[in-house]
Amino acid sequence: MDELTKRVIPCLDIKGGRVVKGVQFVNLIDAGDPVSCAVAYEENKADELCFLDITASSDKRDILLHLVEEVANKLFIPFTVGGGIRTIEDVKAVLNKGADKVSINTSAFQNPKLLKDASEIYGSQCIVCAIDVKFHPERKRYEVYLNGGRAETGREALDWGKEAHEMGAGEILLTSMDKDGTKDGFDINLMKSFTSNLTIPIIASGGAGNPEHMAEVILRGGADAVLAASIFHFGEFSIQETKQTMKEMGIKVRL
């Protein structure tokens, strides 16, 4: 897929080896089974998939690795795994089980050298830096939040984005915590601030309510890819419908 082709990426939240927000868009026998969901999304023309292990404590790590291996055996499209990736050993384990990319969030911020080491060993194309952002009303700027948006860092978002890029991240998964779950569109200004200052691909996350929103963050925000969870999971829109809308709005997609 060339870089002009825009990607649509469903995201599955995993807890203890199960999909948390059950997927209702297709007649799955078991909507909580990540492998069934992954295969269904691939059939529906997803370009990539993202699995976020939202419990990801060390005792759950083995469940996740087993799951990664199962998904890798069934899936042909690339998939990213994130959640609880804290060390270079975690990166190695997930990639060795067949994931195409790893997404690192809190640990990258706390230890940027992890991005550097991981990208030097495995190549920056495997390393996604996930950044959760909120607009700080007093300071009137976008800032980085950790631990699923619960911990304030006080660091300006683009400043961290630039460092993550310099450290070797090959992509940034940029989530607006303000927009997340609202379904009223992406934060275009946030996206533009990243896409106009960085040369690596930026994946937009947080706010998707319909296919037009996804087209808008690409056309107006410069996003390289869009990530969404609930609008796909609950069958409000299919990936194929979304891509058709994007194509009609002049965006190059893989149908």
Curated annotation (Swiss-Prot):
GO terms for molecular function: imidazoleglycerol-phosphate synthase activity; lyase activity. The active site is at residues 13, 132. Keywords: Amino-acid biosynthesis, Cytoplasm, Histidine biosynthesis, Lyase. CDD domains: HisF (cd04731). Gene3D superfamilies: Aldolase class I. Pfam families: His_biosynth. Its EC number is 4.3.2.10. Transmembrane segments: none annotated. Pathway: Amino-acid biosynthesis; L-histidine biosynthesis; L-histidine from 5-phospho-alpha-D-ribose 1-diphosphate: step 5/9. InterPro entries: Aldolase_TIM, His_biosynth, HisF, IGPS_HisA/HisF, RibuloseP-bd_barrel. It is found in: Cytoplasm. It comes from the Bacteria. Disulfide bonds: none annotated. NCBIfam families: hisF (TIGR00735). HAMAP family: HisF (MF_01013). Belongs to the HisA/HisF family. This is Imidazole glycerol phosphate synthase subunit HisF. The gene is hisF.
